[in-house]
Amino acid sequence: MSNSQVIEKLLAKAKRTDLPSFAPGDTVRVHVKIKEGDKERLQAFEGVVIGKSNGLQPSFTVRKISFGQGVERIFPTNSKVIDKIEVLRSAKVRRAKLYYLRALRGKAARLKEAE
């Protein structure tokens, strides 16, 4: 058995199946476990999915505007710190990566609602 097969087998055990399916353009709320000292709490990060990556270690990028400043956060899909993901809204987009939203402000950054 080669090294890559061993790695694939280990990552297959850690794969999460409880998360909903979502696509770039969807507005999601990601509940993340935050550990402060000996306490643990949940923190929500709500924004638009601007990209997903697949492969052995899939991840997705969520962008939001906080106090007029753009904030992006990259989440590993199979991470244990993600408690749950809620899909709030779906948008109709024609791109897999929505990096062009970084340059847009205000109403120009809106996405069309999916039917």
Curated annotation (Swiss-Prot):
Keywords: Ribonucleoprotein, Ribosomal protein. It comes from the Bacteria. PROSITE patterns: RIBOSOMAL_L19. It holds the Pfam family Ribosomal_L19. InterPro entries: Ribosomal_bL19, Ribosomal_bL19_CS, Ribosomal_bL19_sf, Translation_prot_SH3-like_sf. GO terms for cellular component: cytosolic large ribosomal subunit. GO terms for biological process: translation. GO terms for molecular function: structural constituent of ribosome. This protein is located at the 30S-50S ribosomal subunit interface and may play a role in the structure and function of the aminoacyl-tRNA binding site. Belongs to the bacterial ribosomal protein bL19 family. This is Large ribosomal subunit protein bL19. It comes from Koribacter versatilis (strain Ellin345). The lineage of its organism: Bacteria, Pseudomonadati, Acidobacteriota, Terriglobia, Terriglobales.
